[in-house]
């Protein structure tokens, strides 16, 4: 049975993800429309946010472990509210990029704390708790991207700031009730149940290491695709609202993957599933960026979302299926995401800047980087077998 405290934390997670997607993913439409940002500028903005994400998430996990998750969520929500308020006041390109970085710090304090709160003291219920966590944030993200474009067209670009700000205030209003229920839960005597076992203890560390390799590369792909969606939409003559609808399919596919892999656990500690999803991601990444029709774009998105769903699920599940240091592991899990958020768009921007006339050079360079990541995955697996 899920405790009332965890239900409220899942609700906070849902609201937070919707607000985060509404702001961060459609910021690139705002920058393109308001300041004339092209592919290089949008990719560089995404890369800068990714670099901040690495440090903020890593430290966020440590701070959650040291000072408590509830306190850190309060601080993170405060940072998000402050940054979005500044975004409404200062409307130059430079200040908007700085606001994005400040917002990233705030949200990076929230995610590791939420991951820790829903997985702590779960015992044998861990797969269920992580499954609900993944389905919840994926649902918030998918619905957020699907509806954000339409809402922005109706409410105006200013809603990019005030709507997520208002949702974050709602999170702050819910948090005291969640903290009160959590305190009651912690005061109760609970029977410790063992974690879900791997094949052997060595496999636990091996699969955690491999998942921490694969997950950053999945975000290399994601954070290269998202800043380029305004360009894809322009190429296919899609409005902002239609781009949100059409290009949200991969998020719904990821949601379906989370739901399936939550209910079916046969993929736990199975290398073929992790490797196969990595290969599928690479193929569909090229299909996503190089599609010349909406039909091909939709097909590529389905494979893209399914593969990323398993890769992310593996990273979070293996990070939490340990006996201690949940906060630190959650922070490292998020920091690995930040590494991907930085490297992907940085690589794409660099190649577009150096070879601007080459057709599809950004996609090919990042695709090559993904192939390097897959080789690293095989190398880690091979080293384990040989040893």
What are these regions (language model features)?
Residues 56-68, 152, 257-270, 352-353:
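Helix-to-loop junctions at the C-terminal end of transmembrane segments
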Residues 109-122, 309-324:
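Intracellular juxtamembrane helix-capping segments at the cytosolic ends
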Residues 325-354:
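A late C-terminal transmembrane helix in Major Facilitator Superfamily
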Residues 2-50, 207-214, 218-232, 236, ...:
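Helix-loop boundary and gating motifs at the non-cytosolic
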Residues 71-85, 165, 272-286:
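Structural signature of the two symmetry-related core transmembrane helices
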Residues 101-135:
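Cytoplasmic helix-loop-helix junction between adjacent transmembrane helices
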Residues 150-167, 350-370:
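A membrane-interface helix-boundary motif in multi-pass transporters
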Residues 271-312:
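C-terminal transmembrane helical hairpin of 12-TM major facilitator-type secondary transporters
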């Amino acid at each position: 049975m899920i405790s009332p405290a965890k239900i409220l934390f899942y609700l906070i997670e849902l609201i937070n993800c919707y607000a985060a997607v509404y702001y961060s993913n459609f910021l690139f439409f705002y920058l393109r429309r308001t300041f004339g940002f092209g592919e290089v500028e949008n990719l560089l903005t995404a890369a800068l946010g990714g670099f901040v994400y690495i440090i903020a998430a890593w430290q966020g996990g440590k701070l959650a472990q040291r000072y408590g998750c509830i306190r850190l969520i309060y601080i993170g929500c405060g940072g998000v509210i402050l940054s979005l308020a500044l975004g409404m006041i200062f409307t130059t390109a430079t200040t908007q990029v700085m606001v994005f970085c400040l917002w990233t710090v705030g949200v990076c304090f929230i995610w590791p704390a939420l991951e820790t709160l829903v997985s702590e003291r779960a015992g044998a219920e861990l797969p269920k708790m992580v499954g609900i966590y993944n389905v919840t944030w994926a649902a918030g993200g998918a619905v957020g991207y699907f509806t954000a474009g339409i809402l922005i067209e109706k409410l105006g670009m200013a809603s990019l700031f005030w709507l997520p700000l208002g949702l974050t205030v709602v999170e702050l209003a819910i948090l005291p009730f969640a903290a009160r229920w959590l305190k009651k839960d912690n005061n109760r005597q609970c029977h410790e149940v063992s974690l879900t076992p791997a094949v052997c203890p060595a496999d636990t560390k091996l699969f955690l290491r491999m998942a921490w390799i694969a997950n950053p590369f999945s975000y290399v792909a994601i954070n290269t695709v998202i800043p380029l969606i305004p360009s894809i939409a322009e190429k296919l003559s899609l409005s902002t609202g239609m781009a949100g609808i059409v290009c949200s399919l991969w998020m719904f596919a990821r949601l379906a993957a989370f739901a399936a892999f939550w209910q079916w656990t046969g993929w736990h500690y199975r290398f073929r599933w992790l490797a196969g999803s990595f290969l599928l991601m690479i193929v569909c990444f090229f299909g996503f960026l190089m599609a010349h029709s909406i039909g091909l774009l939709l097909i590529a998105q389905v494979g893209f979302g399914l593969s990323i769903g398993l890769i992310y699920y593996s990273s979070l599940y293996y990070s939490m299926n340990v006996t201690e240091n949940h906060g630190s592991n959650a922070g490292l899990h998020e920091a690995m995401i930040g590494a991907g958020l930085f490297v992907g768009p940085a690589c794409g921007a660099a190649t577009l800047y150096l070879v601007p006339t080459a057709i599809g050079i950004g996609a090919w360079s990042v695709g090559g980087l993904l192939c390097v990541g897959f080789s690293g995955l095989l190398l880690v697996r091979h080293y384990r077998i040989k040893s």
